[in-house]
Amino acid sequence: MVDKRESYTKEDLLASGRGELFGAKGPQLPAPNMLMMDRVIKMTETGGNFDKGYVEAELDINPDLWFFGCHFIGDPVMPGCLGLDAMWQLVGFYLGWLGGEGKGRALGVGEVKFTGQVLPSAKKVTYRIHFKRIVNRRLIMGLADGEVLVDGRLIYTANDLKVGLFQDTSAF
């Protein structure tokens, strides 16, 4: 039985990375440094732009985050692909929250737009995931649109984020 809370702490997210939150067969979040959120502040089965589910999560920004030291030297900026990965992470986390089992894998995205950046001077990144569809057959898959905001300003959008849960990834 999944503990379906509306919010999750950093410790909860770390437990997910160890396979402790959604059980041995549930999807896992990555461990640090690839875990791209510090907390989930809202999860619902309704709501969002399509009224089919909504997730909102946050990442606290500080100049000591690992990527600022290497991307780029003298011009530090959070890689856009990490924001995209965070959105995929949240789609998979939501599938586990719904009770889905399997190993989460990103399956694609329809379109991504970057209209801003995350600099070391920022305070907080907010991720918003709006679910469009959940497929619950042999393959469990989530389809969603996502937004990334920095200090309240929209900087990335992604349409048709796709994540699947697989029982066996050996042929993937």
UniProtKB/Swiss-Prot annotation:
<dbReference type="GO" id="GO:0034017">
    <property type="term" value="F:trans-2-decenoyl-acyl-carrier-protein isomerase activity"/>
</dbReference>
<keyword id="KW-0275">Fatty acid biosynthesis</keyword>
<comment type="similarity">
    <text>Belongs to the thioester dehydratase family. FabA subfamily.</text>
</comment>
<dbReference type="GO" id="GO:0019171">
    <property type="term" value="F:(3R)-hydroxyacyl-[acyl-carrier-protein] dehydratase activity"/>
</dbReference>
<keyword id="KW-0413">Isomerase</keyword>
<comment type="function">
    <text>Necessary for the introduction of cis unsaturation into fatty acids. Catalyzes the dehydration of (3R)-3-hydroxydecanoyl-ACP to E-(2)-decenoyl-ACP and then its isomerization to Z-(3)-decenoyl-ACP. Can catalyze the dehydratase reaction for beta-hydroxyacyl-ACPs with saturated chain lengths up to 16:0, being most active on intermediate chain length.</text>
</comment>
<comment type="pathway">
    <text>Lipid metabolism; fatty acid biosynthesis.</text>
</comment>
<dbReference type="InterPro" id="IPR013114">
    <property type="entry name" value="FabA_FabZ"/>
</dbReference>
<dbReference type="GO" id="GO:0006636">
    <property type="term" value="P:unsaturated fatty acid biosynthetic process"/>
</dbReference>
<dbReference type="GO" id="GO:0005737">
    <property type="term" value="C:cytoplasm"/>
</dbReference>
<comment type="subunit">
    <text>Homodimer.</text>
</comment>
<dbReference type="Pfam" id="PF07977">
    <property type="entry name" value="FabA"/>
</dbReference>
<feature type="active site">
    <location>
        <position position="71"/>
    </location>
</feature>
<protein>
    <recommendedName>
        <fullName>3-hydroxydecanoyl-[acyl-carrier-protein] dehydratase</fullName>
        <ecNumber>4.2.1.59</ecNumber>
        <ecNumber>5.3.3.14</ecNumber>
    </recommendedName>
</protein>
<keyword id="KW-0443">Lipid metabolism</keyword>
<keyword id="KW-0444">Lipid biosynthesis</keyword>
<dbReference type="InterPro" id="IPR010083">
    <property type="entry name" value="FabA"/>
</dbReference>
<keyword id="KW-0963">Cytoplasm</keyword>
<keyword id="KW-0276">Fatty acid metabolism</keyword>
<keyword id="KW-0456">Lyase</keyword>
<dbReference type="InterPro" id="IPR029069">
    <property type="entry name" value="HotDog_dom_sf"/>
</dbReference>
